[in-house]
């Protein structure tokens, strides 16, 4: 069920429907950009409330991408203080920590252990159940107010599809799983990237200063950043690409099954075999990115300072199984980061050289260490 872990026809149907629906609601178009810009303004106002005092930005940075997904799926955003929203965010944050823990890696290799031993995998199961119940309640609300001639969001479109076509793939269970997948993939990955981004900019203040200089020159102070600005901001674009390359957020891709027997480089791979690819092998390829362990925006700039694309840049995976929400995630990273740096100077509580940027947990995802900073208005 869903998109992330399904295969064959189920995956094709869910991916096709999800892509089509997200595009119809403007992913990569103006309407979604409006939603992200609105959320960026809310994010800036929330950061302003810190009054330049030391704070851990993790939670606030998680709220913004989660609210964008909420607006697409539920047709409404939540206040950052909303009780249900806070609980949902708490579950998502906890799940990423659990999924990235050594214990979960052991459970993946020896699944029989999960039936007999206590452990955090049980918390993961409970959190997933909570999320699915939350989504199901929203689905029930949508069923009561559904207007087939005027779909409001992703859930409405799915319910209409269920009614129109009696597909085995389009069921309530599949709807809940697909929405859960969109939440999981569209919230935590972006929020974790944002959190690590600010940490890296604290570690490299000269990079942050150059980005702010470009923002001042291209956008100024009197309007919000928009996606049209990106093509005129090669350094900022290079910095965002380098952040994603350097952090290698999902080092090992999700497992996917081979659909038919195949021979690859003298290896025979039978149908049904699960394949796990290493994204690190391309993102940290020494031939493409000299000194790959060094954070250097120059990896994505040519000699003239223009943005330089790379076929090795694939933090969203590659091929037909690449992330459905890549366009949305790239939009969020650009608009959220430029909005933050347009309005604030990032101030570290310790000397940049003393900042530890080593991932605390490195399993499913690279999770940054806890840190604090001050958002000083500019």
From Swiss-Prot:
Cofactor: heme
GO MF annotation terms: heme binding; iron ion binding; oxidoreductase activity, acting on paired donors, with incorporation or reduction of molecular oxygen, reduced flavin or flavoprotein as one donor, and incorporation of one atom of oxygen
Its membrane topology: Peripheral membrane protein
EC number from the UniProt entry: 1.14.14.1
Residue numbers binding heme: 323
InterPro entries reported in the protein's UniProt record: Cyt_P450, Cyt_P450_CS, Cyt_P450_E_grp-I, Cyt_P450_sf, Cytochrome_P450_fam2
Keyword Oxidoreductase recorded: yes
GO annotations of cellular component type: endoplasmic reticulum membrane
Predominant location: endoplasmic reticulum
Enzyme class: oxidoreductase
Record keywords, A-Z: Endoplasmic reticulum, Heme, Iron, Membrane, Metal-binding, Microsome, Monooxygenase, Oxidoreductase
Gene induction: P450 can be induced to high levels in liver and other tissues by various foreign compounds, including drugs, pesticides, and carcinogens.
Pfam families associated with the record: p450
One BP term from GO: xenobiotic metabolic process
Keyword flag Iron: yes
Highest taxon listed in the record's lineage: Eukaryota
Cellular compartments annotated: Endoplasmic reticulum membrane; Microsome membrane
Protein task: Cytochromes P450 are a group of heme-thiolate monooxygenases. In liver microsomes, this enzyme is involved in an NADPH-dependent electron transport pathway. It oxidizes a variety of structurally unrelated compounds, including steroids, fatty acids, and xenobiotics.
Family membership noted in the UniProt record: Belongs to the cytochrome P450 family.
Protein name: Cytochrome P450 2C15
Source organism: Oryctolagus cuniculus (Rabbit)
């Amino acid at each position: 069920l869903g998109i992330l872990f399904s295969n064959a026809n189920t995956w094709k149907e869910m991916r096709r429907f999800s892509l089509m629906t997200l595009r119809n609601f403007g992913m990569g178009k103006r309407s979604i950009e409006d939603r992200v810009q609105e959320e960026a303004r809310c994010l800036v106002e929330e950061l302003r409330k810190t009054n330049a005092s030391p704070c851990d930005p993790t939670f606030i940075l998680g709220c913004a991408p989660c609210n964008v997904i909420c607006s697409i799926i539920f047709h409404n955003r939540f206040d950052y203080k909303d009780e249900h929203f806070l609980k949902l965010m708490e579950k998502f944050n906890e799940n990423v920590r659990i999924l990235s823990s050594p214990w979960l890696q052991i459970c993946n290799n020896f699944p029989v252990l999960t039936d007999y031993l206590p452990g955090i995998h049980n918390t993961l199961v409970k959190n997933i159940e909570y999320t699915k119940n939350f989504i199901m309640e929203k689905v029930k609300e949508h069923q009561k107010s559904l207007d087939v001639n005027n779909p409001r969001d992703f859930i409405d479109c799915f319910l209409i599809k269920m009614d129109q076509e009696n597909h085995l793939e389009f069921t309530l269970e599949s709807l809940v799983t697909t929405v859960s997948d969109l939440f999981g993939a569209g919230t935590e990955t972006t929020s974790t990237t944002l959190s690590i981004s600010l940490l890296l900019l604290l570690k490299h203040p000269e990079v942050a200063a150059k980005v702010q200089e470009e923002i001042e020159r291209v956008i100024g102070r009197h309007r919000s950043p928009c996606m049209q600005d990106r093509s005129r901001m090669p350094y900022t674009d290079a910095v965002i690409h380098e952040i994603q390359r350097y952090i290698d957020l999902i080092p090992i891709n999700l497992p996917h099954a081979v659909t038919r027997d195949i021979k690859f480089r003298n290896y025979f791979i039978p149908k049904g075999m699960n394949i796990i690819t290493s994204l690190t092998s391309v993102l940290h390829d020494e031939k493409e990115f000299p000194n790959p362990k060094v954070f250097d925006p120059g990896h994505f700039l040519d000699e003239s300072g223009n943005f330089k694309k790379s076929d090795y840049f694939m933090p969203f995976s590659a091929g037909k199984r690449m992330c459905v929400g890549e366009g949305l995630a790239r939009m969020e990273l650009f608009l959220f980061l430029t909005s933050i740096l347009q309005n604030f100077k990032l101030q570290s509580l310790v000397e940049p050289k003393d900042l530890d940027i080593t991932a605390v947990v490195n399993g499913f995802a690279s999770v940054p260490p806890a840190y604090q900073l001050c958002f000083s208005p500019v």
